[in-house]
């Protein structure tokens, strides 16, 4: 099963939209603030929030930047 990591920061409206979307679909995910954990932001090449990373093992299968429901749907349904 894929591991989903959502990079977000406080007071970010698109970040809240991504969270609401994933919660509505009952999808489990981890939330990371790239300012609190910059080493993970560097590891996953996160430059802006929200960024959703879908991992298969250690391999990045999908990277979604911003709130893009169609891309999220594709990424989490694989």
Language-model-detected regions and their locations in the chain:
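Hydrophobic anchor at the start of a short beta-strand
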Residues: 29
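Non-catalytic, surface beta->alpha helical segment in thiol-disulfide oxidoreductase systems
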Residues: 56-78
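ATP/adenylate-binding site constellation spanning eukaryotic-like Ser/Thr protein kinases
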Residues: 9, 46, 66-69
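Local sequence-structure signature of Cys/Sec-based thiol-disulfide redox active-site neighborhoods
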Residues: 1-25
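Acidic, metal-coordinating helix/loop segments flanking the phosphotransfer/catalytic sites
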Residues: 36-42
